[in-house]
A protein has these predicted regions:
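Conserved, mostly hydrophobic/aromatic
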Residues: 7, 62, 90, 119, ...
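Alpha-helix N-cap and loop-to-helix initiation/capping positions
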Residues: 17, 21, 75-82, 107-114, ...
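Hydrophobic positions in alpha-helices of CheY-like receiver
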Residues: 25-29, 90, 158, 162
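Catalytic cores of alpha/beta
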Residues: 44-54, 105-120, 174-180
Length: 180
């Protein structure tokens, strides 16, 4: 049976009117269904998070995507500082934090260690680890797929640096031979 429901939006930032609509949806889910709610709603501020928490949202998802040093190579619409501010505001509002990354986007081994260290410093509760699946016609189409050893070493490093965090093998997990 279903334990949790998540509302996910596209784009960088929602308007206050959109936040109000989503808050009403979370309240209805809490009052009528009684399951936990999560949100992945882009870059929000503390007041937005307080409203959403009061309406029933328990966990916020905001991936950092990659290391602070490599972030500008991947994202042009906002900064790592924007992500950090969002995560810290959600945490301050009392929400659980789910934040992770995509590995295999051209980052170095050192970048992967920095991702885990950064997530540790942000005190996240769960971390999805996604593995890039290069797709033709996209900016990362020519990235070489990670080897099994690179994937497994990365997961091991994350487990070592984040011993109490729930690691979620997410997008691309079927690339992990030991997964199935």
């Amino acid at each position: 049976h279903i334990h949790r429901y998540s509302i996910v939006t596209a784009g960088v930032r929602l308007s206050k009117a959109e936040i109000d609509v989503i808050a009403k949806a979370f309240k209805k889910i809490k009052d009528e269904v009684g399951i936990a709610s999560c949100g992945s709603l882009g870059l929000l501020d503390f007041d937005d998070f307080v409203k959403l928490k009061e309406s029933g949202m328990a966990r916020y998802h905001c991936n950092i995507e990659t290391s602070p040093n490599y972030f500008k190579s991947i994202c042009t619409t906002h900064s790592m500082e924007d992500k950090d501010a969002t995560i810290k505001a959600a945490k301050k509002a009392g929400l659980q934090i789910c934040s992770g990354c995509i590995i295999g986007m051209g980052e170095s081994v050192e970048d992967r260690v920095d991702i885990a260290l950064h997530l540790r410093d942000l005190k996240v509760d769960s971390t999805p680890i996604n593995i890039l699946n290069p797709i033709a016609g996209t900016p990362l189409e020519h990235q070489s797929p990670l080897t099994q050893e690179e994937i497994e070493r990365t997961i091991a490093v994350f487990r070592h640096i984040l011993p109490k965090v729930v690691l979620r093998l997410a997008g691309g997990r079927l690339k992990i031979q030991s997964f199935y």
